Amino acid sequence: MQWAGVGMWMVFGLSACSPTKTEIGNLNVIPQPQEVSQDIQAHPFVINPQTGIVYPEGNEKLQRTAEFLASYIKEATGITVRTTTEAAKKNSIILAVDSSITNKEGYQLEVTSENIHLNGGSESGVFYGMQTLYKALPLTKNKQVSAAIPVGTVNDYPRFGYRGFMVDVGRHYFPVSYLKQIIDMLALHNINYFHWHLTEDQGWRIEIKKYPKLTEIGSIRPRTLIDRETQTYDETPHSGFYTQEEAKEIVKYAADRFITVIPEVDLPGHMMGALVSYPELGCTGGPYEIPCKWGVFPDVLCGGNDRALQFAKDVLNEIMDIF
């Protein structure tokens, strides 16, 4: 998968059909597949209410991928298609795992005027191929316009095994709904790791049941620096944290899209959110304050403090139960 520009939509009319016009998408998507060949002169694969997305019976991951694709088709074209385990018929999109594809995240896509075959080296490969199909769809909800995929083939696999994106919620909290939108965008671009920066000097954002003050106190800062040169603050409290159930919800949401969540808890530095909540964990005993500006701060968890070492173990035990 390489990064490159996306092609333009193409439209042509079919006088004998109703709707009166067919809009064809483009297999040249972002990230750019390794190999793409399409024939825009050939009669395309036309999506209609009789289109079926076929997946192997008993394969829950491919069932979920089929359901994703059906929802994406509905979103892009307004057309409702069905998912099924029945034998493939004409006008089907057929999902399958092919062990001969050596790269587990790779896939092969073949589009004819009658059917689409999508084979992946594993379920994740099928998922990435499905995302290519999604991006290849024309955006049309006009009942007078049919949506179609051009005849062609795609052979694709990732250049990098680790494709990550980091979100820092320690300095600025984002709600669960927004994180899900980010994960959807990551899935769309074949990203497979979500790096979740959960704690910072400026705020502790994950519930730790053994240490409730981390979120009762450590998640709140009274104001935030908005102009470094003039040292202007917004005078608005900033807060927010994720319960363990919400964190598990994010982990599952990402996993359903073949994205692994990597939690980050900084220590022994970047720990003012914890020291404000539990001053006895520091080297001086405090008092400590949540920083309202950015930078490096000298106070850290005290490595020679047995309570600090136990704190680190307790926190990581709860984090590992979530992730």
Residue spans for each PLM region:
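Short, solvent-exposed coil/turn linker segments
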Residues: 1, 46-48, 243, 302
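Acidic, contiguous N-terminal accessory segments
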Residues: 17-161
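Feature activates predominantly on carbohydrate-active enzymes
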Residues: 102-299, 303-311, 315-323
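Compositionally biased, intrinsically disordered low-complexity segments
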Residues: 9, 13-15, 50, 114, ...
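Bacterial Sec-dependent N-terminal signal peptides
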Residues: 1-26
